[in-house]
Each structure stands twice: as structure tokens, then as C-alpha cells.
Amino acid sequence: RQRTEKIGFLFSFPVTTISEYIARLITGVVIAAEQESYNLVLYPLKDDPLEQLTRICRAREVDGLLLLARAQIDPAISLLEKESVPFVLVGRRFEQPHISFITPDFVDGARQVTRHLLALGHRRIAYTTRPALGITSRDRLEGYRQTLAEAGIPFDPQLVVETTTQPNSSYQAMNRLLDLPNPPTAVFAIHDLVALECLQAAADRHCRVPDDVAIVGFDDWSMSLTTQPPLTTVRTPLYEMGRQATHTLLNHVTEPDLPAVQTILPVELVVRQSTAGSSPV
């Protein structure tokens, strides 16, 4: 089979909400691809991703694919395996040992957040989950639950609230938490954008952050430096993830029989004023 000297990057997010995430990742991908004289083709996933994927595979448009997809990925994986197209999952892990992936350590990120809040004296720590994100959301929930259990704090399902990508979903979730008879003193948001709405909800209720409620995000988007107050968050190595994913993919392209490479990259808690020095009353 003749090589195209191109790799594809498939992503299934609305481009508007995820632009910074994609941009950082793609920078790493492009630089690694250029080192190997490869070009990059971007494929925003359409309404019928399997049909789109089938066309890409059959037309042999690219030599391999990077898949940035969060949930419902199994049919795509089956198709790529059937078509013998090399691929690497980016930004999530996968349970099967023969699938290559690279992901931030979501479990440890959640553990670092929860440990930080516990060290400040918080005991009622809420978590805003997003079931549509699949395993990446469950991994964070797992890290949060593990760390509470290690501290001897019983898990309270009332403190886990679901959010969606709908506008104001996270704002409403924060209000539900603050309306509880015994509200949380700290909130761990699944993403910085979610944390932004939580900050707004707190401000609208004249709740002081971090004095009345501490708030933590995830991903360390640039806006987290300029929120009021600046946001404690978890920095994920997006550039490095893109770079390593590309090298792994190109190794699979040149040597199809190589075993799968499963990489979990460390993440870093970045402490700012949204938690700094806060302690529950």
C-alpha cells in the first residue's frame, strides 16, 4: 500500500467550545509530524462519524489517524481495525491492551485536587461530573472518591451533580449545590469552563470565593489566570500529548506489527486564589 505522507486528526467537539484544547494539542502534533516530513489533515467529526470514517479509510486519504473522541468510540475502533488503519486514541484511556492511547492522568489529577482541598480543611467537597465525556469523567470521579475514602470521609452522592454542554448547565448545577441544606465548602469542576460558571453562580449569590466556597477547575486554560479570583486548576500536558501521540502513530505506520503503546502522562495542580488559604467555617 502506497504511503500518502499524511496523518489525520479526528475530533468530535464543537470547535467553538474546545478551541484552546485543540490548538495546544495540534501544535504538538504538527511539530512532531513535520519532523517526520508528514502533513496533517483535520477532520471535525460529522453527524454520522462512521460513514465519514469509512470514506476516509476506503479512500486511503491518510496513513494513520489520531482520534480525539471522548465517548462512544467502540464502533469507530472496530471499523479502523477492520480496515487495518493505524490509529492512536488521544485524551482518554481504553481498557483493551491492544489499543494504543495517550491520556493525561485524570485519576491522579482528581486525587491532587481532592488532597489539596482536604489539606485546607474542607470535608464537604462537591464534584461536577459530565457523563457524556465517558471514561474521562468517570476517572476523575474515581480519583475523587478514592481520596475521600483514604481520608475516612463517606461518599455523599448529593455532592456529585451532572452538567452538560448546554449554556448555564454548570451555573444551575452550582446553584443546586449551594441550595443544599448542608452545602459544600469546596467544588471541584470537571473543566475550567464549568468552573467559570460556578464562579459566576457564586458571585451572583454574593458567595465569596474562596472564603465561602473554594472552586477548582481542570485543564488550565489561559482564562483561568484572569477569572475573579484566578482559578486553581490542573494543568494537562496537551502539547506533549500531541507530540507523543504523533510519534506513536508514525511508529505504527512504519511498523504495523509493533505492540500497542499505552501512555498516561502526569498532570500538575496549579494553586491560585480560588482556593488559596480557604478554610471552611
Task: Give, region by region, the residue ranges found by the protein language model.
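Alpha-helical recognition/docking segments in bacterial nutrient-uptake
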Residues: 5-115, 119, 179
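Hinge/beta->alpha junction and helix N-cap segments in small-molecule ligand-binding domains
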Residues: 12-24, 42-51, 102-112, 128-173, ...
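N-terminal helix-turn-helix DNA-binding module of bacterial transcription factors
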Residues: 1-5, 279-281
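Periplasmic-binding protein-like
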Residues: 62-68, 126-128, 160, 181-191, ...
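Flexible loop/turn connectors
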Residues: 171-281
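Short loop/turn motifs at secondary-structure junctions
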Residues: 3, 61, 121, 156, ...
